[in-house]
């Protein structure tokens, strides 16, 4: 098996840049770009297979096939990406879901084991209720990966993902932050990665609870929390109840999950959106289920959102999922957030209309400062979580942190 080498470890972290038309369906297209930009997939291979994916079943078979081919050709980095993301469109009850999640992650930790064996990246498991939250911890590096001798970090960052994340996907962003002088604790919480897929712990909207567990375990204070995607709601939520968080980066506009869900399935602000919201509020379970079923039959993104949502949030049907999502919001606790906050949006986000930022700005009345940065397609960063230009995004986040810390002096 191909192994990562010491020479590879001392190279500076680099990011790919660009967005490609790989599939006519917006969510398949985005996830294929994510596969290339973040996960290590080969662009030329994906360009060939992308147009042949029309259903979730196509996605599964094509990506497993690509993973098998990559393994046969000893292209382990590509195989990790294909196996890991093959699981993405597998649904609850599919025995291959856990199988390929574990296959991809086991390959990941074997392929990059030198990072861990050398001590450059430390792993820990934080007790949380009946499970353990996995954490990767890295201290600041000088350029090319040599750890600084006793140098104080520019800041301590608590980093996590969102609704469908695997924290291994943020491995190289974590290293990039460390390479630039930051100490980083990257963790998975309930509903994410192996905490849900292997340990069986599903989401909680009370994100301050897993965050408290991590802060307590490592005795952290005065940290910056960065939450990606749904983390754009979860991280501010945690900050509302946790004074040890001094700065908040919401790496997605995310005022209210129910509104985001209905925007994606019914269209933002449309008659159908308003009707669906009213039906949910009136507890019209059978009608809501019918509406979502009809939508899911025609739209693979709605199908994925619904199936993943029922699985991740332990809902028995569409109504249960959609109604539960009203608890996943920041608007009802926004007045408790008093820290500096940066909200990051994208002008072509296929999940979240960037116009939703107004709700957040109006609700965050007591923050110390509020910065909003809208990335655009002209910067190759207009898609969800700006995955087409990660370097630009992380450089922006780091600069903001340093500005906020400088203002505190």
Where are these regions (language model features)?
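Hydrolase active-site cap/lid region
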Residues: 241-322, 345
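Short alpha-helix in the alpha/beta-hydrolase fold that links the catalytic acid
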Residues: 173, 339, 353-363
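The serine-hydrolase catalytic nucleophile loop
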Residues: 163-175
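N-terminal cap/lid segment of alpha/beta-hydrolase-fold proteins
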Residues: 56, 63, 99-149
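Conserved alpha/beta-hydrolase
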Residues: 177-194
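Alpha/beta-hydrolase active-site loop
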Residues: 169, 200-220
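Catalytic histidine-centered segment of alpha/beta-hydrolase-like enzymes
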Residues: 376-391
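Short beta-strand/loop motif that positions the catalytic acidic residue
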Residues: 337-338, 343-345, 349
């Amino acid at each position: 098996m191909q192994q990562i080498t010491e020479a590879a470890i001392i190279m500076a972290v680099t990011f790919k840049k660009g967005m490609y038309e790989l599939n006519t369906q917006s969510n398949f297209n985005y996830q294929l770009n994510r596969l290339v930009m973040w996960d290590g997939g080969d662009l030329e291979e994906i360009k060939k297979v992308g147009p042949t994916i029309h259903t979730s079943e196509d996605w599964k078979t094509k990506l497993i096939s690509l993973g098998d081919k990559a393994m046969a050709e000893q292209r382990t980095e590509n195989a990790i990406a294909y196996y890991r993301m093959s699981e993405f469109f597998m649904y609850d009850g599919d025995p291959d879901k856990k199988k390929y999640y574990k296959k991809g992650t086991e390959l990941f930790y074997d392929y990059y084991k030198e990072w861990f064996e050398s001590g450059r990246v430390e792993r820990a498991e934080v007790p949380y209720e009946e499970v353990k939250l996995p954490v990767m911890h890295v201290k600041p590096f000088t350029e090319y990966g040599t750890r600084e001798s006793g140098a104080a970090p520019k800041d301590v960052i608590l980093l996590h993902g969102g609704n469908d994340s695997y924290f291994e996907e943020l491995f190289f962003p974590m290293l990039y932050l460390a390479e630039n002088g930051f100490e980083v604790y990257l963790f998975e919480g309930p509903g994410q990665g192996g905490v849900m897929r292997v340990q069986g712990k599903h989401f909680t909207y009370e994100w301050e609870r897993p965050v408290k567990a991590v802060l307590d375990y490592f005795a952290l204070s005065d940290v910056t929390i960065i939450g990606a995607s749904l983390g754009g709601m979860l991280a501010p939520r945690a900050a509302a109840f946790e004074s040890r968080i001094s700065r908040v980066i919401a790496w997605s506009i995310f005022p209210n999950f129910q509104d985001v869900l209905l925007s994606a399935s019914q269209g933002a602000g449309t008659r159908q959106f308003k009707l669906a919201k009213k039906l949910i509020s009136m507890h019209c379970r059978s009608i809501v289920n019918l509406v979502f079923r009809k939508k899911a039959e025609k739209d693979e993104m709605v199908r994925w959102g619904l199936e993943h949502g029922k699985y991740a949030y332990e809902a028995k049907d569409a109504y249960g999922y959609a109604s539960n999502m009203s608890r996943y919001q920041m608007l009802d606790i926004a007045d408790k957030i008093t820290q500096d906050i940066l909200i990051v949006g994208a002008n072509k986000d296929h999940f979240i209309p960037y116009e939703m930022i107004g709700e957040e700005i109006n609700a965050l009345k007591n923050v110390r400062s509020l910065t909003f940065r809208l990335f655009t397609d002209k910067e190759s960063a207009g898609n969800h979580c700006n995955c087409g230009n990660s370097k630009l995004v992380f450089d922006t986040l780091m600069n903001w942190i340093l500005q906020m810390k400088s203002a505190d002096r």
